[in-house]
Amino acid sequence: MKRWSTAVSLVFTLAAAGCALLPPPAQTQDVKTLSDQTDISRRAAIRLQLATQYLEAGQAATALDEVKNAIAIDPSVPGAYHIRALAYMSLGQHELADDSFRRALSTQPNDGDLLNNYGWFLCAQGGKPDQGMAMLRQAIEVPAVGSPSKPWTNLGVCQMRQGDLDGAEKSLTRATYIDANNPLTNLTLAQLHYKRRDYARAMSFIERVNGRGNPTAESLWLGARIARRLGDVSQQNAWSAQLQRRFPNAPEEAAFERGAWDD
């Protein structure tokens, strides 16, 4: 899985439930802070934070150990089963990931990050694209703070994988309205227009990816192929040279060496 498609949001919200609108005068209420945590919940939260950091660093096995420790300390620690699902997902343990996603969803049915990540899992690894797209549409209704474009992008990628180019274009375009510079969104739109042989539009999107200083082997190879179709030899050579220099062991570089321009 490409790094942009695996870049998941790991934001969790601690929210108090059952707040009374008008509490009785004799009672006092206060905002819950770290000082209100029990020793057990505090230790579990620390373990979960470590698990999140390991997962973000690409150390899924270590992250899994830490989240298991967190659950052993406090099975109710918020977000634990979501993190466990992501760790199993990264390790390719599909059934275990699905079970953890379900457990997380049973306690957080309206968590935008969770709906987005589970929907993407069902599309990309779970073999249930229809269910995944339905869940991504739910995530669109309750987007996570700071990442509302993600479910639109993931829905578009899933639709494209299913051959629905028109639906994919609509979803991905909605994502660009929210975040015009998202590399995965722009890469996928470039791929979509390349499939349609609309090379000029494909170029406009791949330039947003390759021109921002952090291209991938996939984006450079696609860009070189688009440039070749447009007869732009200078740009084709520039991106091909970057591909060779920056990603000498990538499958895309091997395809370049074979001259597989039309694969």
Where in the sequence are the language-model features?
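Terminal, low-structured helical/coil segments at or just beyond the last alpha-helical repeat
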Residues: 23-35, 211-263
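N-terminal leader/linker segments that initiate helical-solenoid repeat arrays
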Residues: 19-68, 72-74, 256-263
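Residue-level recognition of tetratricopeptide repeat
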Residues: 43, 77, 111, 146-148, ...
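Structural signature of tandem alpha-helical TPR/SEL1-like repeats
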Residues: 58-65, 91-103, 127-138, 162-174, ...
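TPR alpha-solenoid repeat register
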Residues: 80, 114, 149-151, 185, ...
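Structural marker of alpha-solenoid helical repeat scaffolds
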Residues: 39, 73, 107-108, 142-144, ...
